Curated annotation (Swiss-Prot):
Residues 273-347 bind DNA. ATP-dependent agmatine transferase that catalyzes the formation of 2-agmatinylcytidine (agm2C) at the wobble position (C34) of tRNA(Ile2), converting the codon specificity from AUG to AUA. Its main location: cytoplasm. It catalyses: cytidine(34) in tRNA(Ile2) + agmatine + ATP + H2O = 2-agmatinylcytidine(34) in tRNA(Ile2) + AMP + 2 phosphate + 2 H(+). CDD domains: RPA2_OBF_like. GO terms for cellular component: cytoplasm. Pfam families: TiaS_FLD (PF08489), TiaS_TCKD (PF22641), tRNA_anti-codon (PF01336), Zn_ribbon_TiaS (PF23783). Its EC number is 6.3.4.22. Belongs to the TiaS family. It comes from Methanocaldococcus jannaschii (strain ATCC 43067 / DSM 2661 / JAL-1 / JCM 10045 / NBRC 100440) (Methanococcus jannaschii). This is tRNA(Ile2) 2-agmatinylcytidine synthetase TiaS. PANTHER family: TRNA(ILE2) 2-AGMATINYLCYTIDINE SYNTHETASE TIAS. The gene is tiaS. GO terms for molecular function: ATP binding; ligase activity, forming carbon-nitrogen bonds; nucleic acid binding.
Length: 423
């Protein structure tokens, strides 16, 4: 007799369903059949994967009972039935996969599975690679269409701490596709009452609710936090449309597990990095409302970009100057190669000097006569040579520490500043 894991991924689409909904229904049915089930996991993989259906997240379920062969067959049949019923097969980009792995094989291959988890966080993994790996660790898989879902299904099974939690509340079927009615004031109150133990509930800068998805899927809202008990209390504070059911998932949301420290010379596209270096080109605005600057760490240089959707965060980036020593957290785009910034940590600020535009004779205002041609005082009319102008230090409108994008622009995996010392 053995215990087992089930992994599922890539069943949803931008228009229909949600893999977590299948997991929730599956757990309900398994419990109804008398099986014991651990808290399910919702695990996000590399956010730079281009063919993801929505958030590139797989789910994993751990059956805690000792199972006979007939039990395993029953569980597999229930799983397959639900996946086939609640998958959007019509969507070209939806390619479901299911993985089954006995707990004995899981324990025997724990180190290999940990390495696989890191790989799906940092790199782009092929279906062929996942197939071979599943067979290598003694698992089984079922592919539909291209079967990309087996990649994330095994990734969810393989995941390791750190974890956070997400409570997902689901809508009644007759409400699917209709506008979600969630009271904004209640979300704000819930956020303030549960801070810092819940996160990404509301974007105060852009006055936007963050707990509700924008797609016509079964999810009514999702509340993220670091304490499952607090999530239960938070759910009851939300006013508006009432959910039909809910489930708490163990997740890797808000953990920064997709990022790793790298030297610029070693950086490659479609991975997540933390890079320490100095600003070597001052930030500038480019087409589209984005802000870009260049960073050097002694091994190379790389462009770092704050995109337009990061809104006010771009104003922080604009205040950086050449010489500032910072850490940049983000993912690497392919063309042109550069870092999409998720947050920065300012470690040391360069002193900033400007020309003293006051007349040294009378204190009046100086006016430039031309490029490096000197200055003339508007008040006493005296002329001052260009190289006679004093440089004075001005206070920087920045402090050392972390600065982050607003919640509405944050990736699932990115750690909010409020969690830096909590997880």
């Amino acid at each position: 007799m053995v215990m087992m894991f089930i992994g599922i991924d890539d069943t949803d689409s931008p228009n229909k369903y949600c893999t977590t909904y299948i997991a929730t229904l599956l757990i309900e049915e398994l419990k109804g059949c008398g099986y014991s089930v651990d808290m399910p996991k919702l695990i996000r993989m590399n956010p730079m994967v281009k063919y993801k259906t929505r958030g590139n997240g797989g789910v994993a379920i751990h059956i805690l009972d000792e199972l006979y062969s007939k039990d395993k067959e029953e569980i597999k049949n229930i799983t397959i039935s639900l996946v086939e019923k609640y998958t959007d097969f019509e969507c070209e980009n939806t390619n479901p996969g299911i993985v089954f792995l006995d707990e004995a094989k899981y324990k025997e291959n724990r180190e290999k599975l940990t390495n696989y988890y890191k790989k799906v966080l940092y790199d782009i993994v092929s279906v062929d690679y996942a197939e071979k790996f599943i067979l290598k660790v003694g698992g089984e898989f079922i592919k539909y269409k291209l079967g990309r879902g087996i990649i994330g299904a095994l990734g969810a099974i393989s995941s390791t701490p750190p974890y956070t939690y997400e409570l997902l509340a689901y809508r009644k079927k007759e409400m699917w596709g209709k506008k979600r009615e969630i009271d904004e004031k209640s979300v704000i109150e819930m956020d303030k009452e549960t801070f810092p133990y819940t996160f990404d509930n509301y974007d105060y800068e852009n006055e936007k609710i963050l707990i509700a998805p924008n797609t016509p899927c079964p999810v009514l809202f999702g509340i993220r936090g670091i304490d499952a008990e607090i999530l239960l209390k938070a759910m009851h504070k939300i006013e508006g449309e009432k959910p039909e059911r809910f489930m708490i998932f163990k997740t890797n949301h808000g953990t920064d597990v997709h990022l790793r420290k790298m030297n610029i010379k070693d950086i490659y596209p479609n991975t997540g990095v933390i890079v320490y270096g100095r600003v070597v080109e001052e930030p500038r605005d480019i087409e589209g409302g984005h802000v870009i600057f260049k960073l050097s760490d002694g091994t190379g240089e790389i462009d770092c970009m704050a995109y337009e959707p990061t809104k006010g965060f771009r104003d922080i980036i604009r205040k950086l100057i050449v010489g500032d020593y910072i850490a940049v957290y983000g993912t690497v785009r392919e063309k042109p190669l550069g870092i999409n910034i998720e947050k920065i940590k300012i470690l040391k600020l360069e002193k900033k000097f400007v020309k003293d535009k006051r007349c040294p004779y009378c204190g009046g205002t100086l006016k430039a006569k031309g490029k490096k041609a000197g200055y003339k005082c508007k008040k006493c009319k005296k002329t001052i040579a260009y190289d006679e102008i004093k440089m004075i230090e001005v206070e920087r409108d920045l402090k050392t520490g972390f600065y982050e994008v607003p919640g509405s622009a944050r990736r699932h995996l990115s750690k909010p500043i409020q969690l830096i010392d909590l997880i």
